């Protein structure tokens, strides 16, 4: 891989300075409002941001589109006092504005299709009217620096100044690693507790947390980025704590991989007059045999089974009082079925011991030939 040279580093520094200047002009301190019927609550804001994230995947749009849509929505909600019943219309209008700003012409969704498939409850004309209101309130200025823009810049600076970072990612390329961080950032943008920080602070906190896992000199890299961005270190520490807590709760909320342990059920074999064994299943339902083949169908969830000593069938005559009811494992019974249908050609005796002493102890002949001494020619 060709690492960026001094000119590329200067270009990254210029982009960072330009983005910070742009953010300082647009960003407003988020003032938490009391939940009421006249104001959009923080939970309602998070729900509509998560809805926009689903629309981003539904219409296969860029992450930059979602980042710009959420930034436009937050800027608009910080400027005006919006009623909650108009929140979906405001959000879909910001989403459509972001798509027209970021996406190529052929990737921009048709307005009628967007209004229909998003189930926003708004018509195309209502979305267009809300678009005009949003543009007027934002002074027709949609080119704002999003947290995703800062994430791209910080990640590029980290890769260019710390080449050893690439060796810490043996299975991921820099672009794939950036995609993983992008997904985490999109989740953090749906958290209203992180609105108190600027987008640059949020992106730097995520990069700092990730560098802490990968390289030993992550602290020096964080200080360098902090000085270039001209941020407060105390705010960065507080933002790191909130981001780490949010990502930890996000990972703990994911469904775990279920592991099922199969425990075979016990069956009782009753001997009849003619030497025929009749199988009496236990009261707990066990595995069946499919109609297509003779192999058992393993149940999805195994259940603990116990030995059930069932009485002999009425048609069977008990010839001896000393005769005991023989019990067989289900696996042994399956082996007998396989032999009956000539399915024992599979090598299942790999782990068997071929010694004669062991076969004598077990009371049966070993399928392997006896060991012979090696004769020296």
Swiss-Prot record:
InterPro entries: Cyclin (IPR039361), Cyclin-like_dom (IPR013763), Cyclin-like_sf (IPR036915), Cyclin_N (IPR006671)
GO cellular component term of the entry, any: cyclin-dependent protein kinase holoenzyme complex
GO annotation terms (biological process): G1/S transition of mitotic cell cycle; spermatogenesis
Gene3D superfamilies linked: Cyclin-like
Chain intervals for the UniProt region annotation (Disordered): 357-377
Keywords (A to Z) from UniProt: Cyclin, Membrane, Nucleus
One function term, GO molecular function aspect: cyclin-dependent protein serine/threonine kinase regulator activity
Tissue: Highest levels in adult heart, brain and skeletal muscle. Lower levels in adult placenta, lung, kidney and pancreas. Also high levels in fetal brain and lower levels in fetal lung, liver and kidney. Also abundant in testis and thyroid.
Pfam families: Cyclin_N (PF00134)
Composition bias, Pro residues: 367-377
Localisation per UniProt entry: Nucleus membrane
Organism superkingdom: Eukaryota
SMART domains: CYCLIN
Family designation: Belongs to the cyclin family.
Record's protein name: Cyclin-I
Organism per entry: Homo sapiens (Human)
Lineage: Eukaryota, Metazoa, Chordata, Craniata, Vertebrata
């Amino acid at each position: 891989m060709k690492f960026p040279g001094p000119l590329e580093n200067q270009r990254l520094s210029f982009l960072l300075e330009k983005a910070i200047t742009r953010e300082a002009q647009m960003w407003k301190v988020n003032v938490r409002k009391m939940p009421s019927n006249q104001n959009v609550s923080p939970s309602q804001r998070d729900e509509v941001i998560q809805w926009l994230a689903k629309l981003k995947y539904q219409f296969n749009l860029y992450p930059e589109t979602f980042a710009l849509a959420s930034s436009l929505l937050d800027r608009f909600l910080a400027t005006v006092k919006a009623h909650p019943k108009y929140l979906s219309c405001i959000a879909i209008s910001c989403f459509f504005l972001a798509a027209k700003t970021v996406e190529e012409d052929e990737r921009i969704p048709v307005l009628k299709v967007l209004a229909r498939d998003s189930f926003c409850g708004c018509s195309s004309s209502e979305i267009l009217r809300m678009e005009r209101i949003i543009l007027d309130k934002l002074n027709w200025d949609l080119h704002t620096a999003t947290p995703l823009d800062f994430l791209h810049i910080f990640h590029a600076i980290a890769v260019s100044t710390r080449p050893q970072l690439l060796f810490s990612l043996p299975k991921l390329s820099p672009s794939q690693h950036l995609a993983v961080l992008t997904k985490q950032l999109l989740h953090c943008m749906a958290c209203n507790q992180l609105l108190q920080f600027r987008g640059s602070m949020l992106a730097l906190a995520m990069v700092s947390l990730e560098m802490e896992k990968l390289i030993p000199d992550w602290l020096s890299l964080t200080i360098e980025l902090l000085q270039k961005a001209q941020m407060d270190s105390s705010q960065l520490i507080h933002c790191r704590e909130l981001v780490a807590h949010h990502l930890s709760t996000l990972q703990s909320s994911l469904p775990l991989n279920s592991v099922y342990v199969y425990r075979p059920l016990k069956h009782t074999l009753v001997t009849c007059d003619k030497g025929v064994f009749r199988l009496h299943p236990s009261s707990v339902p066990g595995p069946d045999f499919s109609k297509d083949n003779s192999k058992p169908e393993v149940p999805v969830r195994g259940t603990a089974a116990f030995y059930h000593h069932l009485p002999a069938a009425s048609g069977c005559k008990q010839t001896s009082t000393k005769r005991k009811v023989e019990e067989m494992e289900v696996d042994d019974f399956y082996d007998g079925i396989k032999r009956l249908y000539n399915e024992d050609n599979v090598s299942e005796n790999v782990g068997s011991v071929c010694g004669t002493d062991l076969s004598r102890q077990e009371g049966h002949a070993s399928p392997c030939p006896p060991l012979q001494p090696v004769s020296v020619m």
